[in-house]
Amino acid sequence: MDCSIKSAFVNAGFGAWYPKGSERLERSMIYHGCSHEMLFTREPFADMDTSKPYRIKYHALKKAIEQGYTHIIWLDCSLWFTRSPNELMDKLNHDGGFFIQSGYNLAQTCNDNDLVFGKLNRDEAELLPEMWTCIFGFNLLTDKGQKCWHYVEQAFNVGVFDTPRDHANGSADPRYLHARQDQTAVSLAYHLSGYDCAFPPNGIVADYKDNEHSLLFRQGL
């Protein structure tokens, strides 16, 4: 990669099982020859409100950016690698972002306030795929990558990361099912930034033993 690139995989988690999953993930990355920085945190950030746990991804990404990293991929504690993580960073460098569709659309996972932030109506949102945030990344050396982080920050500031996990009267529209906090925020940022590089679900990542050819498995502890 270019010498101006500073790349990192980011993970954070605290509580009962998240640190154990984080350790499992780290071991798999070392075993399979990760050649990029691994910024792993297993305790709450000092400026984080622990009563709002979905904020942790924002704080972890912000810290990486403040440290000067340009190519950043977030990884959930439920993941582990079956081969080299370097494949992901190569994809990120080539495409300017790394995202995987969840199988939902944004009409299903954005409450009314989220749609206001995204400047969308629900008919428009129904045409836009939601992204997973168990794994995603952006390249800040690109215009789209910079825009993506800008919109993630805006989403954090207006409370998209704090929406209730259940329906909680988020919309009277029957298409709305539930909000997804960080997943909603990143999905809106993806579309607002003009990205068009998302992979379909269940290819790169699969539930444990569902697809032996997947780069990552996903399973809680």
How should each PLM-predicted stretch be described?
Residues M1-T70, R175-R180, S193-G194, F217-L221:
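N-terminal anchoring/stem segment of glycosyltransferases
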Residues D2-S4, L92, L127-E130:
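Extracellular/periplasmic catalytic domains that process cell-envelope and extracellular macromolecules
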Residues K57-D112:
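GT-A fold catalytic core of metal-dependent nucleotide-sugar glycosyltransferases
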Residues E126-L221:
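Catalytic core and acceptor-binding pocket of nucleotide-sugar-dependent glycosyltransferases
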